């Protein structure tokens, strides 16, 4: 899917959630919730400190590394639009349609999708290019997109999208 998007000339934007090394941009409520879940933000782990910018575990996985010119949005929260320049990047290029993929479906993907819709973007979420640790929440988040005639855009799988990209080429 990534190779096809690049080959078709689409702008690929990468996002990743993380905080400053001193955690000065980490709200108390988020810190407390993360501690309750057993995964405190900033805690040391096998990939470095959890959700801390600059740590190995904060980086994109090797298979999804950006190419030259592909923006990387470092977001302090769940939504890729909040406290970032994502909207400016998209608007300055005349982009009005987003193909959304990522993790976690019910949190970051959903937050970004809803914010994009509120900002007037047309959105397509790729069901099998999104993931969650909880299959039931993944399914529920995808189901919510299509309610009321597609209130949050549309959903398709990667095979359908790849087919549409081939036809458009």
Give residue ranges: language-model regions:
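A short, N-terminal amphipathic alpha-helix
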Residues: 1-11
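Active-site-adjacent betaalpha module
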Residues: 7-8, 19, 25, 30-169
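A cross-family glycoside hydrolase active-site/sugar-binding cleft signature
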Residues: 15
């Amino acid at each position: 899917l990534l190779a096809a998007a690049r080959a078709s000339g689409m702008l690929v934007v990468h996002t990743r959630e993380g905080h400053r090394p001193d955690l000065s941009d980490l709200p108390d409520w988020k810190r407390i919730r993360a501690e309750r879940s057993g995964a405190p933000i900033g805690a040391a782990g096998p990939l470095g400190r959890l959700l801390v910018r600059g740590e190995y575990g904060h980086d994109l996985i090797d298979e999804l590394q950006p190419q030259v010119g592909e923006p990387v949005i470092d977001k302090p929260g769940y939504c890729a639009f909040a406290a970032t320049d994502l909207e400016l990047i998209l608007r300055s290029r005349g982009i009005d349609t987003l193909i959304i993929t990522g993790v976690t479906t019910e949190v970051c993907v959903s937050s970004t999708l809803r914010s994009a819709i509120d900002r007037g973007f047309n959105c397509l979420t790729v069901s099998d290019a999104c993931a969650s640790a909880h299959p039931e929440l993944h399914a529920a988040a995808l189901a919510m997109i299509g309610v009321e005639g597609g209130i949050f855009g549309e959903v398709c799988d990667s095979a359908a999208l790849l087919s549409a990209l081939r036809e458009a080429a």
